Design a protein with these regions (language model features):
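Conserved "HGTGT" condensation-loop signature of ketosynthase/thiolase-family condensing enzymes
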Residues: 1-133, 145, 153-157, 168-314
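Membrane-interface segments at transmembrane-helix boundaries
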Residues: 137-138
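Short-chain dehydrogenase/reductase
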Residues: 148
Length: 314
């Protein structure tokens, strides 16, 4: 079964579309969710969830699945897969500080739902009426690409006709304290992925085709496995984040490299989704694939990769 990307949503301070991930604005203010999706439903939601609402809304509309009347397909046909490593860290830290300084009884009842790791995936599903399988990944360096993989797996396994895949990381004091002061993207990206047949049935355009996914120890071995599955060298390589270890110059020599982290900040759990969105933007700007999206260096517990192709090259 061929799985395609039929919708993309990008909500970053310096980029609001897939092509802008390749050519971002020089400066921009932080994302203000109420300006994008209105105030309704934002109260008591943490920043990660608010950003996720914005990216989900953009992706579903871009895919033709959402309009002013709501979801245009049965909610049970849409799975929700989200990825974030730091999403509700500020809520957890605030709750722990309250317990340490006072007692558990002093905690906020409004904060309690946000303490669940699944709050992003569940909140987005409830807001948009997505009643298919619901997954939340907090899986370190490879989390975003893992989310894309599991969304494709749900589709290939017949559990859903399509899936919304979302990656988000907020920027706040708790996250910066945890990451040693590193600036995160303070934004989100979302993809709608579905079977080629499903997209064709509703007249949706395929913006990219998802190829094979690989995961294991070592970035070099990950790239070798991707090369075997594609049978070709990539035209563009989306680099993993290099906080823990640099990517050797000897890997994929001569291939153009694109480092989203260098441009936008620490992507962490959102990186893989951002990379796939950037690949779609590259195809839209006339690029010819394949594009390798990779996450995790040799210093991480694993490396992962996905190859994407433009629809015309599939």
């Amino acid at each position: 079964m061929t799985v395609v990307v039929s919708g993309v949503g990008v909500v970053l301070p310096r980029a609001r579309s897939a092509p802008e991930l390749l050519a971002p604005a020089a400066e921009a203010p932080p994302v203000e969710p109420k300006d994008l999706v209105g105030r309704k439903g934002l109260r008591y939601k943490d920043r990660a969830t608010q950003l996720a609402y914005c990216a989900a809304d953009a992706a579903l509309r871009n895919a033709g699945l959402l309009d002013g009347g709501g979801l245009r397909v049965p909610g049970g046909t849409v799975a929700m897969v989200a990825s974030s490593n730091y999403g509700n860290l500020d809520t957890i830290c605030r709750a722990m500080d309250t317990i340490a300084e006072h007692t558990a009884a002093a905690g906020s009842a409004m904060d309690l739902p946000n303490a669940s790791s699944n709050v992003i995936a569940s909140s987005v599903a409830i807001r948009f009426g997505l009643r298919g399988p619901n997954l939340m990944l907090c899986n370190g360096a490879t989390s975003g690409l893992d989310a894309v993989h599991w969304a494709a797996t749900l589709i290939r396994g017949g559990r859903a006709a399509r899936a919304l895949v979302l990656g988000v990381e907020p920027d706040n004091e708790s996250v910066r304290a945890f990451t040693g002061g590193s600036r995160t993207i303070d934004g989100a990206a979302a993809l709608v992925v579905e079977s080629e047949e499903s997209a064709a049935e509703r007249g949706a355009s395929a913006q990219a085709v998802l190829g094979d996914y690989v995961r294991g120890a070592g970035l070099g071995r990950c790239l070798e496995r991707l090369a075997r599955t594609t049978g070709d060298r990539p035209a563009l390589w989306q680099l993993p984040e290099q906080r823990a270890a640099a990517v050797p110059d000897t890997l994929l020599e001569g291939v153009d490299r694109h480092d989203l982290g260098e441009v936008f900040g620490l992507g962490s759990g959102a990186l893989g989704v951002l990379q796939c969105a950037a690949a779609v933007g590259w195809f839209a700007r006339g690029g010819a694939g394949p594009v390798y999206a990779t996450a995790g260096t040799d210093a991480d517990d694993a490396s992962a990769g996905i190859a994407l192709r433009g629809r015309a090259a599939a």
